[in-house]
Amino acid sequence: MIAIIAEKPSVGQDIARVVGATEKMDGYITGNGYMVTWALGHLVSLALPGTYGYTRTTAEDLPMIPEPFRLVPRQIRTDRGMVTDIAAGKQLKIIDEVFSKCDSIIVATDAGREGELIFRWIYSYLGYTKPFRRLWISSLTDEAIREGMANLREGSGYDSLYAAADSRAKADWLVGMNASRALATASGSANNSIGRVQTPTLAMICARFKENRNFVSTPYWQLHIALKKDDVHRQFFHPEDFRDKNGAEAAYRRITSDSVVTINKVERKTVFQQAPLLYDLTALQKDCNIHHDLSADKTLSIAQSLYEKKLVSYPRTGSRYIPEDVMAHVPALLEKVITMPWFREYGRTFDLSGLNTRSVDATKVTDHHALIVTGVVPEGLSEAEAVVYEMIAGRMLEAFSPRCEKESLKMECVCEGMDFRSQSAVIVNPGWRAVFSRKEDREKDEPEGNGGTAVFAEGEEIPVMGYGLAQKKTLPRPLYTEATLLTAMENCGKEIADGQAREAVKELGIGTPATRAAIITTLFKRDYIERSGKSIRPTEKGLYLYESVKGMMVADAELTGTWEKALAQIEGHTLDPESFMLSIREYTGKVTGEILRLKFPEPSSRAFTCPKCKTGNVIVKAKVAKCDHEGCGLLVFRRFLNKELTDQHLEQLFSSGSTRLIKGVKGKKGASFDAAVAFDADVNLKLSFPKPKGGKGK
């Protein structure tokens, strides 16, 4: 018998059907010489500090460096603390039973770092040494599964992939556990957590927020003239802004004495805008956030669902290219795409015989090629699934369409010795831009005036029809959205305009395409950041943590980027995992020491009278606040729904009976709203909503 292990039940069932295993058992399917089982995501994890004897950590215990790390069944948080997940424990026993009855194993977990880690940790925890081979496929269609089963790869070929995943997990444990406990020790509060990747990301968000909030706007003035001849009129702008009002007004008075100007330069040329590359996960997440307001995590979840429905290729890819052998299938795929309702209009003129090959480059393909559709006809999709599928299919059409051809026009004139310029462009042949024909794309090309690219002649004298002096003001860089934050994570916070330079720095980015959404989601879940419209801003709790660690190594985005590069080198066989772990241990020691040296103000000695018994005092601890009077029983958990009650929240609650308005509270059904947390008549926590403004309409 041969065991096959997938990452989740739905994938296991698909594989079982293809290989002819039909007899369903508890946790696996058997038949035709196969036993197909599955994980439920990460069934095994690294043990928590308590397993190593670190229960009440003091400064002397830090840093905690387990030697060796231990693996345990997945743990979940309960009122009794962390306990083994019953479902995980049960499935591990089933996998153990399946493996014990088989001679060899086929690994069919997702073909990437996390998928490899899921299997290897199960394999190691259960103590197996049986040979295994890898099913490495980029889609879950029956054809792809059959082809993959016919071309299984040796498991040892993925040892470096496992080493990178294992090293990343251990690095995250070392930095996160030690830094968080160091901060708790230094501050006397266990209400904050620090992560190797999450904290630099939070630091970028907080730094941008503070820069935006503290920005002092300054005025400046722009000078322009309006020229008109027949039906053609253009606005010409002076190329330099005026920072001084008196100077701007003097220049304005000067030019108003000139009623005719001479056009001294006319430059018209054809320019081409390249078709965009195919999507990798991050590019898809950015566009879905920009155009459809989908979060990075939601986009990933939908893309994963489309993958499991066999509609798109593996979504957690970091490549925007495909190799030549995949390109051979593209014409047939596009032939199906242009029959879909979204693209029928564009498909009428689309030429399948001369496809753009900019996205074809095997040297730039990593573990998986770019995101493409599989050709399976989409049916029964939810509204959100249809949106993401349309984005992926539409990007395929864009990527293989001709370049966009524009006609660019630049004109210059002199008015009273001052230069003025006009610049515009019109689309001659939209090429790829006709796929979606987005309004914002068209607006970028509207000329300053009218008349298309009709021009004044060089040397021609044109009457001035108007003069303008517009006062404007400098604006701060905007708060991050999820789309711009993903770009910042790719570039380690650097503002990089040049495309080639941006590609080069990607290997130094924060996180990977597969993990960035989870990093952002973690910051939301831990109440460090919140949404304000489409923007992201830090919470009071997030700003407090940022102010505590800013300038430290643990908040340094570029330093975190070097660790990501090192993990990629492990995967690429150019760095020894043990060398990486040695460096991480040293880094952990430095980070821990840095945090332990922090000086925090003494906790407020203000005591709150218990609102329940009116006799005892409320003692505020890391996870609860409770009355010290025997028999009272007042107990307030700091975690309420999805929010962590900060010290300020508790002070408001015990002083006035209610906190101020807290943004982004999530109810039990997942709906998000703004509400205060207050005491009810029995001194239990409840939600309190602001009264609506104004009276009722008639």
Regions found by a protein language model. Name each.
Residues 9-16, 33-36, 40, 59-62, ...:
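Amphipathic alpha-helical transducer elements in NTP-driven molecular machines
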Residues 243-279, 285:
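Metal- or metallocofactor-binding catalytic centers and their adjacent structured scaffolds
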Residues 1-169, 173-175, 350, 476:
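Intrinsically disordered, low-complexity regulatory segments
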Residues 1-3, 110-111, 188-191, 268-277, ...:
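Conserved short loop/turn motifs at secondary-structure junctions
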Residues 17-23, 38, 47-48, 54-56, ...:
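Accessory interaction regions appended to the cores of large information-processing enzymes
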Residues 87, 93, 100-101, 140-227, ...:
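C-terminal or mid-to-C-terminal helical accessory/interaction module adjacent to the motor/catalytic core
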